[in-house]
Amino acid sequence: MSRYRGPRLRVTRRLGELPGLTRKASKKSNPPGQHGQARRKRSEYAIRLEEKQKLRFNYGVSERQLVRYVKKARAQEGSTGTNLLRLLENRLDNVCFRLGFGGTIPGSRQLVNHGHVTVNGKVLDIAGYQCKSGDVISIKEKKASKKLVEGNIEFPGLANVPPHIELDKPKLTGKINGKCDREWVALEINELLVVEYYSRKV
């Protein structure tokens, strides 16, 4: 399953607020569809599937990518759910979003893909790069690159930069100083349900 490129508000009507996907809020409260979906008791599978979809759409990853992250999270010490969230939070496109370089994760991914972002002084155009402690993420020293970011950083998609990331706003630079704490994950998600969803599939 590839990355979603359809209407974003349609997704948020179904799954709720996804700060990484869009800052806009739908004026319609009913689920998408001709008459909205009939309200009925959902199965445990449907609930787990919905939590998994929240993760996919918020971080903008494909199903195949998410499966890889789940496998990697399982192989690490500690809680699989927390490990999974940290892997997604450490993606370069998400770090740029949390720094305010892009208004959304898709917008931040575009900055990375188009070569406007450097990591440790070198241009890096891999949105899924896993940022690690000590990495310095900057906007390229070009007028066009800086112009793309300056408007976003004044009105970031999320109000607060997490404490594990140090932002130097005038220099358009951020530094990773550790791991993201669970409480600073901006998405309302039950990651344990996502782990349960994949327990028999992966």
Swiss-Prot record:
Any idea where the S4 RNA-binding domain is?
90-152
Q: Where is the composition biased (Basic residues)?
A: 1-13
One Pfam family in the UniProt entry: S4
- The superkingdom listed in its UniProt entry is Bacteria
Does this entry carry the keyword Signal?
A: no
The entry describes its oligomerization and partners as: Part of the 30S ribosomal subunit. Contacts protein S5. The interaction surface between S4 and S5 is involved in control of translational fidelity.
This molecule's function is given as:
One of the primary rRNA binding proteins, it binds directly to 16S rRNA where it nucleates assembly of the body of the 30S subunit.
Q: What is this protein called?
A: Small ribosomal subunit protein uS4
Organism of origin is Prochlorococcus marinus (strain MIT 9515)
Q: What is the lineage of its organism?
A: Bacteria, Bacillati, Cyanobacteriota, Cyanophyceae, Synechococcales
The gene for this chain is rpsD
